[in-house]
Amino acid sequence: MPKIKTNRAAAKRFRKTASGKYKCGHANRSHILTKKATKRKRNLRQTNHVRAEDAGRLDRMLPYL
């Protein structure tokens, strides 16, 4: 049986926590930031957690994480 390949795009965007959940960064924070409010940009700094419905999909994409 061959090894399962890790989806490299997902591996760069998601990290697994000790409890087994996935965390990632927020979108909309790379450019065109002048029109966005300071409060919004500050809130985008925090990590985002993946919903349980999508976690199963990530488990298949990241088998060794």
Curated annotation (Swiss-Prot):
Gene3D superfamilies: 4.10.410.60. It comes from Xanthomonas campestris pv. campestris (strain ATCC 33913 / DSM 3586 / NCPPB 528 / LMG 568 / P 25). PANTHER family: 54S RIBOSOMAL PROTEIN BL35M, LARGE RIBOSOMAL SUBUNIT PROTEIN BL35M. GO terms for molecular function: structural constituent of ribosome. This is Large ribosomal subunit protein bL35. The keyword Ribosomal protein applies. Belongs to the bacterial ribosomal protein bL35 family. The keyword Nucleus does not apply. Keywords: Ribonucleoprotein, Ribosomal protein. InterPro entries: Ribosomal_bL35, Ribosomal_bL35-like, Ribosomal_bL35_CS, Ribosomal_bL35_sf. One of its GO terms (cellular component) is cytosolic large ribosomal subunit. Pfam families: Ribosomal_L35p. One of its GO terms (biological process) is translation. NCBIfam families: rpmI_bact.
